[in-house]
């Protein structure tokens, strides 16, 4: 009897991203402060395979905005866990609204390079 491989968690998918590459991309962002939508866009653009697989984890939710929200939450948890390695620190958990990858405006965390 064949076994079906376990579905990877969002955390496992994000941990596939090379931390040094992500840290370098974050450090290349203009300015010292930025919101988490900037990092969402970096991951979507430079780590497209992982980003697409994250979206697939939440495809059952069907609504694209809800899927994006879930992916963003998981990326936020990842950033918080690996902030030191990424050389960033969170300076505000609910900053000013900014535009996300869906073109919608939502509140997001503010981060600073360290």
Give a label for each model feature:
Residues 2-28, 37, 42-114:
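Phospho-regulated, low-complexity intrinsically disordered regions of nuclear gene-regulatory
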